[in-house]
């Protein structure tokens, strides 16, 4: 049987809260998912690549600032330009 996974948006890291509270909340959300027996998969664009599941270093970089907010209207441009963005 496959392990359950839970998709989490990354906007809390990039636009939802100020640093370092944004990182603390995102890590707490992932831990809450783990406590329920599932694997958290925070979704973001990292340097132009779609990532489903982020490393602690990637979460820190997104939380520190400078990331865009990804949506349908700018997704192609963000990917082509190698940008990082929250979902």
PLM regions: where:
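Generic structural signal for well-ordered, non-membrane alpha-helical segments
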Residues: 18-26, 85-87
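Generic N-terminal amphipathic, Lys/Arg-enriched alpha-helix
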Residues: 4-17
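N-terminal glycine-rich phosphate/adenylate-binding segment common to multiple enzyme folds
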Residues: 77-87
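Glycine-rich nucleotide/cofactor/substrate-binding loop typically near the N-terminus or early
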Residues: 10, 23-78
């Amino acid at each position: 049987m496959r392990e359950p996974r839970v998709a989490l948006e990354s906007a809390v890291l990039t636009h939802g809260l100020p640093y370092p509270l944004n990182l603390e909340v995102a890590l707490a959300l992932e831990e809450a998912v783990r406590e329920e027996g599932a694997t958290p998969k925070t979704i973001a664009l990292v340097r132009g690549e779609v990532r489903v599941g982020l490393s602690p270093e990637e979460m820190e970089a997104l939380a520190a600032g400078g990331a865009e907010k990804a949506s349908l209207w700018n997704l192609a441009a963000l990917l082509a330009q190698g940008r990082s963005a929250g979902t």
